[in-house]
A protein has these predicted regions:
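N-terminal accessory targeting/assembly segments
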Residues: 1-103
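Short, surface-exposed secondary-structure boundary micro-motifs
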Residues: 20, 34, 72-73, 91, ...
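Short beta-alpha junctions and helix-cap segments that line functional grooves
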Residues: 27, 39-41, 54, 69-73, ...
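Short, compositionally biased
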Residues: 43-49, 80-91, 142-166, 184-199
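Short histidine-centered loop motifs in beta-beta connectors
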Residues: 54, 59, 119-128, 159-167
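P-loop NTPase nucleotide-binding/switch module
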Residues: 97-140, 145-152, 169-229, 244-247, ...
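P-loop NTPase catalytic core
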Residues: 221-222, 228-545, 549-552, 564
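C-terminal amphipathic alpha-helical interaction region
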Residues: 539-585
Length: 585
């Protein structure tokens, strides 16, 4: 019999219940008020008193209202039909809901029960299978989706029967399994999984090493991220976090893209809803939305649903990773999620940590980032979740707890800087403060040596050193004046500016410059390094400035030209002639 409870106190969206039976941590309950049923999650149990966070507005909720517990945690429903869907944090299909505003207590089924899917069996009767083993395959938007043994299945099962190739709905039984005790299990295309529990149906989780191409030079060349890697993008308002995220999600070499708009302003979420269906996937020429799932929770929705939205997104990503797919998960922004945690922690009168965030913020963030990664599945195939979260620190302060704690766990750090954004140097990633720890991995070094060449990482470290040196000289020139430093210093400074303008800066709105393939990035890097190694002859600082401005202009025109086209080669020849003109004899 289901446990029941009665409301004994309400503080905003935290409700205290007195219960008449056993209740588990993170269990879901429904509180009845005025004909609506409000979904809530247990966050603390003290004897017969239970604290729950409500995922809806608690306006009008009174002491004495009835609550009924479901006996399960917050779960997502997984199966074919999720691609190109827009969900909220509780996996309600937003397209099925009526009206401009979401109504309280209204829940929709996330999948389409009526659609038929063409099923192709991969297993046969008599096969031994375990949890997450592939039984068959359906195609959705040209993506091969696997139908798997239920994730919670224990031990080894035998396939008793499996349907032949044909069209079936998600609720049709496609296979019958027999477990070790002889019990029959009917399997359809639907899976359920609690969002707070990580899926561990894989053989091993090695260190990731394969470069994830994004087409963004400041990432791929200078601070690369790998398939199954983690990164985060902190930056104050107006520095281009969202544009950079859009560029990565559009261009990255991933099979599935999941966007969790968690606590963003409503206008930004609407922008995602209207822009993404229009974006063309550069890899397939089809609409990017066909392989994208958007999970939206705006800042004016109840805070508890923000927390649910990031976990829902990660669980859906783990589902696709179990199929051997490469998933890219973008969360915008994890700061709003941390603020939701802070709000609940404060309402429960827990001991506050720095800036009143919960004391266990560090472990919550690290556990969440730890769910991403590159895995080898039980059948030897590989899958990955690459997770990139944005952080919106208050006032652009990168020393606040969310940024500091994320820095400990994310291996890539792309610091967006107000100063670079003000100078219109986009993407406004600070090349000196940003880093990628994957460059230090021997596995990654070996991969890059085979994929590109053995000198690549040495060259990348050289341009970072030159950028640092250029910054130091710029400060000296500011203090001492142009005449106060030697001409050689001006040359070093302008060589660092060449690296900045040609490699780091990129036009996200130009068709050619927006996406730079690795082959082209290699040529740009080699070209810039060769120029930096060349000694030039100058008499005064004005000559240095005029000469390098001409050079930067030609290189910029090359970036806007199609790779290896006549126009590109023409500019390349002009550049070579210009270099010869001033070469020190």
């Amino acid at each position: 019999m289901a446990t029941k409870g009665t409301v004994s106190g309400v503080i905003a969206n935290m409700v205290t219940l007195v219960v008449d039976g056993p209740v588990a941590q993170n269990e879901i309950c429904y509180i009845s008020t005025g004909g609506d049923k409000l979904m809530a999650e247990v966050i603390k149990v003290v004897g017969t008193q239970v604290y729950v966070q409500v995922f809806e507005s608690t306006r009008g909720l009174k002491v004495g209202a009835e609550a009924e517990f479901t006996g399960h945690m917050l779960e997502v429903t997984l199966g074919p039909g999720m691609l190109s869907k827009n969900y909220d944090g509780l996996q309600n299909d937003l397209d099925k809901m009526d009206g401009v505003f979401l109504k309280r207590g209204q829940y929709t089924y996330p999948l389409d029960k009526g659609s038929k899917w063409h099923f192709v069996p991969l297993a046969k009767a008599g096969d031994k299978v375990e949890a997450a083993a592939w039984l068959g395959q359906v195609d959705e938007n040209f993506q091969p989706l696997k139908i798997m043994v239920p994730f919670e299945q224990k031990g080894v099962c035998t396939v008793k029967s499996i349907v032949k190739e044909g069209d079936y709905t998600i609720e049709d039984t496609i296979a019958v399994l027999q477990d070790e005790e002889g019990k029959e299990i009917k399997v359809n295309m639907i899976q359920k999984w609690p969002v707070k529990r990580a899926m561990t149906n894989y053989r091993e989780k090695p260190r990731p090493f394969k470069l994830l191409e994004t087409g963004v030079r400041v990432i791929d060349t200078v601070n690369p991220i790998v398939e199954g890697g983690t990164g985060f993008i902190p930056g104050p308002f107006g520095t281009g976090k969202t544009v950079l995220q859009h560029a990565i999600s559009k261009q990255a070499e991933a099979d599935i893209v999941i966007i969790a708009a968690c606590g963003e302003r409503a206008n930004e979420v609407v922008e995602i809803f209207t822009e993404f269906p229009e974006l063309v996937d550069p890899h397939t020429g089809r609409k990017l939305m066909e392989r994208t799932i958007i999970i939206a929770n705006t800042s004016n929705m109840p805070v508890a649903a923000r927390e649910a939205s990031v976990y829902t997104a990660m669980t859906i990503a783990e589902y696709y990773r179990s199929m051997g797919l490469k998933v890219l998960l973008m969360a915008d922004s994890t700061s709003r999620w941390a603020q939701a945690l802070r709000e609940m922690s404060n309402r429960m009168e827990e001991l506050p940590g720095p800036d009143a965030f919960p004391m266990d913020l560090s472990s919550i963030i690290s556990n969440f980032y730890g769910r991403a990664g590159y895995v080898v599945l039980n059948n030897g195939e590989t899958g990955s979740i690459t997770f990139i979260g944005t952080v919106s620190p208050a006032g652009g302060n990168l020393k606040e707890p969310v940024t500091e704690n994320t820095k400990k766990v994310a291996r890539c750090f792309y610091a967006l800087e107000q100063d670079r954004a003000d100078k219109k140097r986009y993407p406004a990633v600070n090349p000196i403060d940003s880093y990628s720890k994957y460059i230090e991995y021997p596995e990654f070094e070996n991969y890059i040596a085979q994929r590109i060449n053995g000198e690549w990482i040495g060259k990348v470290n050289e341009i970072k050193t030159r950028l640092q040196r250029g910054k130091e000289i710029a400060e000296q020139i500011n203090i001492l004046g142009d005449d106060g430093v030697p001409v050689e210093y001006h040359e070093i400074f302008w060589k660092s500016e060449l690296i900045d303008f040609v490699i780091l800066q990129q036009d996200a709105f130009d068709e050619i410059d927006a996406v730079t393939p690795m082959e082209r990035q290699e040529e740009i890097l080699n070209m810039v390094i060769d120029i930096c190694h060349t000694d030039f002859a100058f008499d005064n600082f004005n000559e240095v400035m005029d000469y390098f401005k001409k050079m930067i202009n030609i290189c910029k025109q090359m970036n806007y030209s199609k790779f290896q086209s006549d126009e590109y080669n023409q500019f390349h020849q002009q550049l070579m002639d210009l270099v010869e003109e001033r070469k020190a004899k």
